Design a protein with these regions (language model features):
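Bacterial N-terminal signal peptides
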Residues: 2-13
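Short, low-complexity N-terminal intrinsically disordered segments enriched in polar/charged residues
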Residues: 14-51, 150
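Short beta-strand edge/turn micro-motifs at domain boundaries
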Residues: 17-18, 123-150
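Hydrophobic pocket/interface hotspot
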Residues: 36, 48-49, 56-58, 69, ...
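A mature extracytoplasmic/lumenal domain signature
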Residues: 52-53, 64, 97, 110-112, ...
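A short gly/proline-enriched turn/hairpin at secondary-structure junctions
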Residues: 57-68, 82-86
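Surface-exposed, charged secondary-structure patches
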Residues: 72-120
Length: 150
């Protein structure tokens, strides 16, 4: 009888354990962010934007303003960073942490750094809500908070 209770207890514990998505979300999102920075640094807006979910509910929150829709976000980046004659600083990410929430949802926190030559010109923390769509993690929501200027 004691053995039966052990089997039941193990079964209950297994059912209660959170389900992890297949693969390694932390590594996959890390690869996505490195590719995203490389696209940015090459001037490839379409590549950079391919990591955002291409729909009207994709959201971007920065400095108290929420922008909705992939196209609106694309247009913002095009006008502010990728237009002819605009200077675009070199982008890197650090302190990337990813937490799976469900089989196909995760959130990530990290810091962005923008350098112009050897000078840091902007930085700050951000949070991403991501969804696995097919083989790719895509950004549903991006909340970026630039650090105050010194």
């Amino acid at each position: 009888m004691h053995g039966a209770w052990c089997v039941v207890a193990i079964g209950v514990a297994a059912c209660a354990a959170p389900k992890r998505p297949p693969g390694d979300p932390e590594a996959e999102v890390g690869v996505m962010l490195r590719r995203s920075a490389a696209d940015w640094n090459r001037g490839d807006l379409e590549g950079f934007m391919s990591d955002y979910a291409r729909d009207s509910l994709t959201s971007y929150l920065r400095r108290g303003h929420v922008q909705y829709g992939w196209q609106a976000l694309h247009d913002h980046y095009q006008a502010d960073y990728f237009a002819a004659g605009k200077h675009r600083d070199s982008l890197t990410f650090e302190e990337v942490r990813v937490r799976p929430l469900t089989m196909d949802l995760a959130y990530a926190t990290a810091r962005f750094l923008l350098h112009r030559g050897d000078s840091l010109v902007a930085s700050g923390p951000f949070t991403l809500i991501l969804q696995k769509r097919g083989e790719r993690w895509q950004i549903l929501h991006d909340h970026t908070s630039p650090d105050p200027k010194p």
